[in-house]
């Protein structure tokens, strides 16, 4: 960036424009506009992201107005949704009154309950704000052609080829260049703009500088963008290529996380601005400059219609009333049960991810037996690792995307000699090379024709088996290239060694420190059971581009298998336990840790590394597996109602069949419905039926000296939970802008994302089928309700120290409540580091 800035200051003089803002002012507007874009992770580890992330410095209401003007986006459900809730009695007059008490930043908002009900139940039209204009809109006005869509399609076609991660076999010849340079090189040969009628494209390309930042400065001057509206204009342009801008924002996020930098987003903005200049040149004779001059004034004089402001204010009040109704109903359940007395020692302690899907299974397991205590913790279980599969030198980050891996753990083969391990590595690598060559033959542009004729019929049997769910359409990447014998023995290796020039494994001191941190963060420091099961989670689906979005977000879009297997090997290590004992943390000799994986699609739990479990615990293990199987049946029965599986059907078979059905658009509901995040000991809410809508994090503040664990919870899991909640929220209230549309129309592009159909922008967020069942919302849009049992002063101090946390809370992006020792809600956070009694 510094080099680009220097280039801007030393560029050759041009004809003085009629409008020349300071270069530093333009750069700052670029920076702010780019920060407004939320990142989009690629499909290989598709994690939930708050789509409003770049606007959390604004209030929820202010962001609703900004996005309405810049993207034509909604931030509330259709008004009929709230009207139905009022008619059914779900939203009461008391809820409407409570919503009105919070006020509205917009003039003309309904002033009382009667007015708000009349607004909801009346026939006043939904607000449709005019979107801030671009030169493409001005060109449309003088030609009648939707140039904004044309430009988006052409940029998307180029981006799909340039950013391709391995799907295409004919790569862009300019892929080695930075994005803007690559686009310019291709555009110099491409005649598509001229054939589409943009005859000024080549002129624009010639007069624009070669660096992205220089181009942005030149275009801003050329188009006379009002300085007071420059950030809004640039943000508006980025939102016109929202998906690709979001992917570029991810590239920057990832680079900065590891101490680097990335300018892809700036390059994309420059590309979009060149198109603005090209359209300006192309239709100059049709008066586009005059039209643009009059339209650009909206960026300075943004005066919305009072009726539109009133409609927006009313809809936002109805959304708040809907959330007040949820609070009234849910809070009445909390504290209504008597906290269970914890036995001197439980037979099993089972720790699960805080994921809302775990709530149903945990409750089922507690129903099966009261001899098992369940615990909630982020699914990476305090072990932020990069896990490198066998025969690879790089792996995926198995931790929340807010963190970087602290350790590199490589796979090896249990019980094998170094020679045998190397042989297994070579065999897998060879199998992968053969498979890649065969795939290239099948899909390459020329050889594919020779493949279909002579070889196609040989695939009839596989096609039938895949359709029946007996086999997978493609091998699972975790086991691909391994023979059955090796597959059973592949496991993480903790011993330090060198792989690809990097040190893998963990020293004893690192293992002890990691174990201590994990156990304290779980509030698991005493009263250990004979068996302690650490249960990660993953999902089983086929033909699903967004499959990793159903895996563990706390594990970076991977399953939690690697984390729990690493954690268990460390916690069962006698040397580690000796080190923990020196630190005052004593694990009984008869306590054995187990690694398990909860399949959230089928509710089956797999226990790993059984060969390492001592014979003394064989009976305990057998009994636990029976309990887990029984809990799975209960959980499947509960979930079957939402999946619309009939009661006369064999539910277990039907659920498992869905997981293998490649025509199934809803194999499971994921985190749809997520609404609450509870941080407290489990006995405060045990027995409360939360319907898989609550993240449950175990926490005992009396054991948290200095409140370091509380600070970690409020700055990591709470943020991640809000990202998940707001992704579902955005995908529900406006799937066009914040979601990915109809799953049945998806086409994967570059293995990194999806298009809806064969053109248009890269899609962000969740498919419509992930939030709606075809008749009604399965995810009810509401902001996350965070409830924490901890001293209010401690929570307030943490909020004051962390700007992002304070912005989320003070600006109304999530709610925060305090719980007492009985699990009842006692206080709510009202902003400005202040609380009030509920």
Swiss-Prot record:
Keywords: Cell membrane, Membrane, Metal-binding, Transport, Zinc. It is found in: Cell membrane. The keyword Transferase does not apply. Zn(2+) binds at residues 353, 355, 537, 552. One of its GO terms (cellular component) is plasma membrane. It is a peripheral membrane protein. Its cofactor is Zn(2+). GO terms for molecular function: zinc ion binding. InterPro entries: DabA (IPR018752). It comes from the Bacteria. Belongs to the inorganic carbon transporter (TC 9.A.2) DabA family. Forms a complex with DabB. PANTHER family: INORGANIC CARBON TRANSPORTER SUBUNIT DABA-RELATED, UPF0753 PROTEIN AQ_863. Part of an energy-coupled inorganic carbon pump. This is Probable inorganic carbon transporter subunit DabA. It comes from Roseiflexus sp. (strain RS-1).
